[in-house]
A protein has these predicted regions:
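Positively charged n-region of N-terminal signal peptides that target proteins for export
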Residues: 1-4
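Bacterial N-terminal signal peptides
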Residues: 7-17
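Intrinsic-disorder/low-complexity accessory segments
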Residues: 21-158, 204-205, 210-212, 216, ...
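Structured alpha-helical segments in the cores of large, soluble enzyme domains
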Residues: 107-109, 181-192, 217, 229-237, ...
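Acidic, glycine-rich active-site loops and adjacent beta-strand->loop/helix elements
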Residues: 125-127, 163-168, 206-208, 237
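Divalent-metal coordination cores built from histidine and acidic residues
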Residues: 155-160, 167-204
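Short, solvent-exposed turn/loop segments enriched in Gly/Ser/Thr/Pro and often Arg
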Residues: 162-166, 177, 232-240, 784
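Core alpha/beta catalytic barrel or barrel-like domain that forms the active/cofactor pocket
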Residues: 187-208, 230-248, 267, 271
């Protein structure tokens, strides 16, 4: 027996030695240690190294899809050799536990023992945060080659998904950094966005999944593996600390299962404790960071709506040595930062070592609590199914406020000071005591009035009818739900619910499913709390948006169904994307065709027609059957071929015209200029992507070309997105360094020198005015409405107080509406608004709002959109929303022979608000005689 043990030991030792010889260390492969000063690996090298790691039986290399630039995005699965052989079995268990369908608690308990916990660790999402991908390299090497007890236990209990989040960005940033021979001069100030279209916003795309990388990642997270833990690495940590991480600050989203929040706190505590045990100070959490768990849309945060424990760390460190500064308040130990770090010089390798410790903390926690994590994911999914199968009321601030209002209406309120405010102690300013008692003693009947009110129940489901103006966009919305791992059903025949008839082909989403939080989040408004530093103080800036309800943004028509319902519904398989329904092919019609202006896809068809040389017109007045703005196309074989394809692929319905209409205006393809700048603009990048999807030809134009003048000879339309036009008295562009990304002119490579510069009031605005006067069209979005002020048009900022005869913008404690959906009224008579309805949901991010001067109309300025109520909030947080009543959200202004269209709301925000895309598209055609 002793000889057998010796033989086994020798075999294991030799296999480990051979493995070490087969797999090169990072130093051997890259020529430097990961974390060495002034050294970065690019994607080509990293991809090759990860393929080297596949020599280990602990690994499986998976290509998860192509990036926007055509690179292969990979995921390295790491576990014990035994587990690698049975990956499909463990993947199936992970998905079963996540879906929680058809399982008893006993069966789930057994599966939690039979399965392996799945942990996702990614790197490189934000390419300039170079620690992310480099810690992934180092951690993967350690997991593949180490044979200590902790690593072996981790490999036995965990399935680890090591995911490259942004191959294109790593290649760009690292190549740029390393091409400089002098290490002291190396920098990351690249001339363009490090994700082809959206740069930093690639971490805001996880519920829309516009980018290919987002689709690749979410497919693994929500369909293929559904990990129990997702760890998303970022930089940089708050000044005076090393790393910010979980537990996170409030608020958290009220749709989550409470077990999710306590699980995040548990893992976060394990991470903090690991660093403390290793003598690594500087971890800050909760109030020590800006990061919350409210937002849906990030690689970490989107997982919360799928019952996954999502983790984020933001850590200091760069290839160039840096310094931890003196921040006195960070030097006081407290619950946010129990072990402060002292000011010191900091090297990149230290950040790599911290990351390795944190990764091991997460993996060790997962190994020790493998069955709990698996079972708890099941439990959260089961809870969701049960909540969606009965009457349920989600708790939120609006429900709490409604109880208070019910109590106030039921008995007289008294001075709040008598009872010490809300809860008697530490209450918000203005808290009301009801009937002489503290709010905590409000009668139960007032609770019942709200949280047992059948009209206030959460919906049992939603119906998206075929019968809506833009069903093609509704199908896109349905596919987002399917990509997000939701159960979607489709009606195989007509049916009736609550007395309303629905056609076959309509879609149904019920809430009795494991990812119920995600279902509700797609349809229901977010109810963000009033979050201030202290009563009467400034607002606490949210991590990102506060309201984003996708169905609102996309303009989807749907019905909320509060009671259980059934019908001839066929369940769609998980991940089975829906093809666009087939529209009837247009008949041969000698008088031509009408195309609806209400459907976004109509613009694709129109642009394809124009590119094919087919004449296209728009109705300037409504006909007996078609609204104003409808497209008219004369019959030709070429036109019919384009429309046949559009009917088949885009669900564009071409309606036969009984005769050629009289009140029509020809349109042509316009020469479109889209502003951008050195270093890249995310709003411009998103707009660029949108225009490519809808087949608008355009040219990206940089400030120097604008300043060269003679714009009308080159362009018909100019698009100025947020950040392009400075406010009066300031220079343009939202990147530093005079539009050079922080570099001196001499450091810019020759091929990019024409990209530098910025728009200015002094030089650029007069040239833009000349362009307008000559008949050009300019569209501004968001803050670029500053152009109207620079042109001295009869419009003013509506959100100001007048102090000492001067306009002073509202303070944050008076007005604050960050990343929120509001309802605006629309003048549908205006050509700029063709295809729109009388009201529209708009994305408002502390956006410009206008008051028109008394003589504005006589000077050619017309309101396009405005806020007609003192409560325009639809989803999110709108402090001071009453100040918006009757203010203008968008306007058109005649300037000479041209027109300026200014939209305060973000009508193209991250390519999400399909409901307002037409507000841009309508302005992108040249009007006049056919060529």
């Amino acid at each position: 027996m002793k000889k057998i043990y010796i033989a086994i030991f020798c075999s294991m030792f030799l296999s480990g030695s051979l493995l070490a010889q087969t797999i090169p260390s990072p130093k051997e492969f890259f020529g430097f240690n990961i974390g060495d000063d002034y050294q970065l690996a690019n994607f080509t090298q990293t991809e090759a190294y990860f393929k080297k790691l596949t020599a280990s039986p602990r690994t499986k290399y998976v290509d998860i899809g192509l990036t926007e630039e055509g690179r292969h995005q990979f995921m390295l699965v790491i576990s014990s050799p035994e587990n690698i052989k049975k990956l499909e079995q463990y993947r199936t268990i992970s998905k079963k536990m996540a879906h929680a369908e058809g399982l008893t608690d006993e069966e789930a308990h057994q599966l939690s023992l039979d399965g392996k916990v799945v942990v996702w660790i990614d790197g490189g999402l934000h390419a300039t945060e170079v620690l992310g991908i480099h810690q992934l390299i180092e951690t993967s090497y350690q997991l593949v080659t180490r044979n200590d007890d902790e690593t072996k236990k981790i490999l036995d209990k965990d399935i680890i998904l090591m995911v490259h989040a942004n191959p294109d960005g790593q290649e760009l940033i690292s190549n740029w950094y390393m091409k400089e021979k002098d290490p002291q001069k190396r920098n990351m100030n690249v001339p363009r966005l490090w994700e082809k279209y959206v740069g930093h916003d690639n971490n805001r795309d996880s519920y829309m999944m516009n980018m290919k990388e987002s689709q690749n990642i979410t497919h693994q997270q929500f369909l293929d593996w559904i990990p129990q833990i997702v760890y998303n690495h970022h930089q940089s940590g708050p000044a005076g600390s090393v790393v910010a991480g979980p537990p996170f600050r409030d608020p958290f989203n009220y749709l989550y299962d409470p077990l999710l929040m306590t699980s995040i706190d548990e893992v976060g505590s394990a991470m903090n404790s690991r660093l403390n045990a290793e003598g690594k100070p500087g971890y800050t959490q909760r109030s020590g960071t800006e990061f919350s768990t409210w937002f849906n849309g990030g690689v970490r945060t989107a997982t919360y709506f799928h019952n996954t424990v999502g983790l984020l760390t933001e850590m200091i460190g760069s290839p160039a040595p840096s310094t931890i500064p003196v921040v006195p308040e960070r030097l006081i130990p407290n619950s946010a930062t129990p072990f402060p770090v002292l000011p010191q010089t900091w090297h990149f390798r230290q950040s790599v070592e911290y990351s390795l410790s944190l990764n091991y903390a997460v993996l060790n926690y997962a190994a020790r609590h493998s069955d709990e994590l698996l079972y708890n994911m099941y439990r959260m999914g089961k809870n969701s199914i049960e909540r969606g199968s009965k009457d349920y009321w989600t708790l939120s601030p609006k429900r709490s406020d409604a109880i208070v209002e019910a109590a106030k209406a039921g008995r007289p309120a008294v001075d709040s000071t008598a009872g010490g405010g809300r809860g008697g102690r530490g209450g918000a300013a203005g808290a009301v005591t009801i009937g002489g008692a503290r709010n905590g003693n409000i009668a139960l009947k007032y609770y019942d009035e709200v949280l047992k009110n059948p009209e206030l129940r959460d919906p049992r489901g939603y119906i998206i009818s075929v019968d809506q103006p833009d069903f093609a966009t509704a199908v896109k919305f349905v596919n987002l739900c399917i990509r997000s791992g939701l159960i979607v059903q489709k009606a195989t025949a007509a049916f009736t619910v609550n007395g309303k008839n629905y056609p076959a082909g309509s879609y149904i989403l019920k809430t009795n499913q494991a990812f119920r939080p995600e279902v509700l989040d797609r349809f229901e408004p977010e109810n963000h709390p009033n979050d201030f530093l202290y009563p009467g103080g400034p607002p606490i800036k949210p991590y990102d948006m506060t309201g984003w309800t996708v169905a609102y943004q996309m303009g989807i028509k749907f019905d909320r169904i509060l009671d259980d319902f059934n019908g001839p519904f066929q369940r769609i398989s998980y991940g089975e994307l829906q093809p666009m329904p087939l529209a009837s092919a247009p008949a041969t019609a000698k008088n031509g065709y009408f195309i609806s202006p209400t459907a976004n896809n109509s613009f694709i068809a129109v642009n394809d027609l124009l590119q094919a040389g087919v004449g296209v017109y728009r109705l300037t007045e409504a006909s007996a059957t078609q609204p104003a703005g409808s497209f008219y196309v004369a019959y030709s074989e070429k036109a019919k071929a384009v429309l046949d394809k559009a009917a088949k692929e885009l669900y564009v319905k071409a309606v036969t015209a009984p005769k050629k209409p009289k009140n029509i205006e020809p349109i042509n393809t316009a020469r479109i200029a889209l502003w951008d700048q050195y270093g890249g603009s995310m709003p411009s990048g998103w707009t660029r992507w949108m225009m490519e999807q809808y087949h608008f030809p355009f040219k990206v134009v940089y400030p120097q070309e604008f300043d060269a003048g003679d714009l009308k000879s080159k362009f018909d339309v100019i698009i100025l997105v947020g950040g392009a036009v400075p406010p009066p008295g300031r220079d343009g562009g939202n990147f530093g360094g005079g539009g050079r990304g922080g570099r001196s002119a001499g450091e810019i490579p020759d091929e990019y020198k024409t990209w530098t510069g910025r728009l200015t009031v002094e030089k650029t605005v007069p040239l833009l005015k000349t362009f307008l006067e000559a008949g050009g069209t300019i569209v501004t979005v968001g803050t670029s409405a500053n152009l109207a002020y620079a042109l001295n048009l009869p419009v003013h900022n509506a959100l100001v107080d007048v102090v000492g005869g001067k306009e002073v913008p509202f303070s944050g404690d008076k007005f604050y509406i960050p990343g929120t959906i509001l309802r605006a009224s629309v003048d549908t008579r205006q050509p700029a608004n063709y295809g729109m309805e009388n009201e529209v949901d708009v994305m408002f991010d502390n956006s410009p709002v206008f008051k028109l001067d008394a003589d504005a109309a006589s000077k050619g300025v017309k309101p396009l959109m405005w806020f007609s109520t003192d409560k325009p909030l639809r989803s999110g947080w709108a402090w001071g929303q009453q100040y918006l009543k009757d203010d203008v959200a968008a306007f058109s202004a005649q300037v000479g022979a041209g027109t300026l269209y200014s939209f305060g709301p973000e009508i193209t925000f991250r390519a999400q608000p399909h409901g307002t895309f037409k507000l841009l598209f309508n302005e992108l055609y040249k009007k006049g005689s056919q060529k």
